[in-house]
């Protein structure tokens, strides 16, 4: 979990007091590529720490997948509406690559929140930042042409273009796989 600790410290969080106990309370799990981590309808209040790999949030409507977000390590994630132990997930969370993940159970998170007041602040700020970034990205995408969306994706997520399937990128950008294929062909012809 060293990558995630450095990530938090780079953001200005002091995790030195609670890190040892935090590390003892998480469990490690390796998710293989395409494995579903959380499914819709599942009660899941776990907090996941993505140490290596890449995951996506997606839903399925009338047999069609809609990718809502893609996260790269290091980061933390949870079911969007499954943070409360009584709430039910409305999304799939899937490992897009083999991913090393640490899982913090709700009881352990509550214990750490009580013992270390700063721990809750880290979680609250992290999930607020995640939500804010998602809203900004969603708004930005609506204002761009499909070509601009793809160019923005290449600029801001350069490692993902060759790492994950193109149909997932197309879904994330809100365009069809065929449109993405045409855009890519035009861009590569210009090079």
Which stretches of residues belong to each language-model region?
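Short phosphate-coordinating micro-motif centered on Lys-Gly-acidic
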Residues: 37-42
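A small-molecule sensor/coupling module
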Residues: 89, 108-145, 149
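Glycine- and acidic-residue-biased ligand/ion/polar-headgroup-sensing regions
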Residues: 34, 45-56, 73-74
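Short acidic-glycine-tyrosine-enriched beta hairpin
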Residues: 61-77
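Cyclic nucleotide-binding regulatory module and flanking cytosolic helices
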Residues: 1-28, 82
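Phosphate-/nucleic-acid-contacting segments
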Residues: 144-191
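Ligand-binding loop in jelly-roll beta-barrel domains
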Residues: 65, 84-107
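Short beta-strand segments in beta-sandwich/barrel cores
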Residues: 27, 54-58, 100-101
